[in-house]
Amino acid sequence: MGLNLKAPPGAASTAKAGGEAAASLLGTASGNEEPRLGAAMRELTRPSSNAGRMLMCAPAHYCVDYTINPWMENQIGKADNALAIRQWTNLARLLAREAELAFVAPAPGLPDMVFAANAGLAIGGTAVVSRFATKERQPEESLFHAWFEREGFKIAPWPRDMAFEGAGDALLDSSGSLIWCGHGWRSNPGAARLLETIFARRAVSLRLVDPRFYHLDTCFCPLADGWLLYYPPAFDAASRQAIAELVPAEKRIEVGEDDARLFACNAVEVNGRVFMNDASENLRRRLRAAGFEPILTDLSEFIKAGGAAKCLTLKLSET
C-alpha cells in the first residue's frame, strides 16, 4: 500500500502538500540529513482518506543531551540522529497506512519534542496541554498550545503548578468511558480528578513505582475490545488491584521484564495492528491469539531517551 499521510488544513506548523511545507515542518536538520528527511516528509504529505488522526513531530533536532529518566543515563551524545530519522520515518510510513498523520514543527534545542504523546491529551475536540514536570521540556508547552489552538481545539484551562504530561500519563480505554491516569514520577496525582471534570468521564489513578517506567504509556497499553497489554511490576499493589477489578483476567496480556525493557507496552494500536519496537515470540503469539497483529519496527535510537512507538504519537480523534 502506498503512503497515506495527510496534513490537516489551516495549520501553519503542520505539513501541507508539497516540498515547501515539508521544509517548514522539519525545521533545520543537521548535516546531510536535511535533504534526506525533507524528501521523506514530502512523500509523507500525500492525502489520506482513512479515518483516525495522529500527531507526530519530526526528529530533526533529536539527540540526548540531558538526563531526565533512567534510559538517558550514559547516553548523552550517543544518539544517532541519522538513524533516528530513518526509524521515525519507517514508523510514520507504517502508521500512514492506517491513519491520517498531522505534524507539529520541531524546534531547535528541544530534542524531546519528538515525543508527541506528551503534547497533551485530546478528546472530542477538547485538548489539555501538558505542564511538564522537568524544566528541560517546559519550553515545549507554548508550542504545543499554539498548535492545538491553530487546529481548532478548545483548550481546557489547567493549573500552572500541577504537572501533567499528556497522553504519556493519560490513556483512554477502548470504550471511551474511562481514562487511565498514571502518577508517581511525572504527573500530579490530582490530575485524574481534573480530567474527570474536563472530559466528563471516569478517571482511574494508577501509581507507578519503577523509575524506568516513568510514564503510564511505557508500561500500559489499552487495546481494542477491552484488551490490555501491561507490565504489572511497574505499579503498586493498589493499582494492580484496580486494574484487576476493571479488566477481566482473560483480557489482560501481562508482559515480563524482558519485553517491558523492549518497550513492548509503548505500542500504538490502530485497526487491530499493534505497532511496537520489539517483542518476544511468546508475546507476539499471545497478541495474535487475542486477535491483534503485532507490527515490529526498530525504534532503538528513541529508547535511548526513554520512548518508542507510543511516545512518538498522539491520537487526536479519540471521542
Show which residues each predicted segment covers.
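The feature marks the mature, well-folded catalytic cores of soluble enzymes
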Residues: 2-10, 18-19, 23-319
